[in-house]
Amino acid sequence: DEFDKRLELIKESLTALTGIQPKEYRASRKEAVVKVNGWSWIWDNGAITLEINTSREGREFEAEFIRMKAGPTEDSIARGDASSRARKADIKQHVRKEGKRVVIQDIPMVDQGQKGYCVVATAARIFAYYGMDYVDQHELASLANTSADGGTNTAAMAENLKKIGTRFQIRIKVLDSLANSRDFRNLLKAYNRAASKLKKEKVENEHDWSGFWDNADGEVLKLARAGSPSQVDRWLNAIRPYIMAGIPVFWSVQLGIVPEPLRLSQTRGGHLRLIIGFDEEKKTLIFSDSWGAAHTEKEMPLADAIA
């Protein structure tokens, strides 16, 4: 099939380029996030590995990814392990403070492209930041069973992060949540009170969660969730200790409700991004998206972010 043809073409091209025959190997789940088959070309002046992950259920064949790594030595592209994880003292050195502006720097960029891999791309950035750059978004997508069109459901995001955290013995702590029916009902009450004040349309259906986000008014949400200084302070106080310690915060949002500082390839629906800082003087949140270099460091008003 097309996958096998493409794989053989790549292998033949690498063999012709290097002038040596590859060595085949397998990496188990103990050595990798998912099982992979691989081939390596090692010579005096360089090293290349080619790896694939596939699965089969009955007669159905699923090709997950083909990836290639190249470097000047075999060690430079070797798969790392838990010993390469960064220490708390190391990550705190990435925090930059300028007056009342605090930003975590040096978080590697992973571009999710058009695939809707926001959860795994964002998680891969965190792993790389913590010194675990042997974990990539394609492996994480396979582990979390993330499809190209299934990366934007908020509940699915939480479940996928839980799977990833369990696999790597990483604790995930929820700082703020709208993930259950009680949270939603409380939000709905606050939203309708704010809508009355602003003389805007209320939401009557208590069960249509997705419909609410599709039609929510940004100004009403801001008044409901960030209408008082205490609401803003409470939200900022929850993330401040993590940012000061050099720990980025996962941030699940609904796009299309408040203005964005840059045009996005995704304009509506759920999305996962990173909170990397804040400016207490300007009352802004500093964040990062997994859409390439232009989205490394962006800013929006705290009230918009909380909404």
Model-derived features with residue positions:
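Short aromatic loop motif centered on NTY/YTY
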Residues: 25-41, 46, 235-238, 294
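Short consensus segments that form the blades of beta-propeller domains
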Residues: 2-5, 148, 262-267
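Active-site-adjacent substructure of cysteine-protease-like catalytic cores
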Residues: 194-201, 209-288
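Long, charged/polar, surface-exposed segments that mediate recognition or autoinhibition
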Residues: 1-34
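Extracytoplasmic/secreted proteins, especially bacterial periplasmic and envelope-associated proteins
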Residues: 9, 13, 117, 121-125, ...
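Active-site-adjacent structural segments surrounding the nucleophilic cysteine of cysteine proteases
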Residues: 56-213
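Noncatalytic regulatory segments and standalone regulatory/sensor domains
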Residues: 56-102, 256-267, 276-307
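Short, surface-exposed coil-to-beta transition loops
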Residues: 35-38, 45-51, 267-273
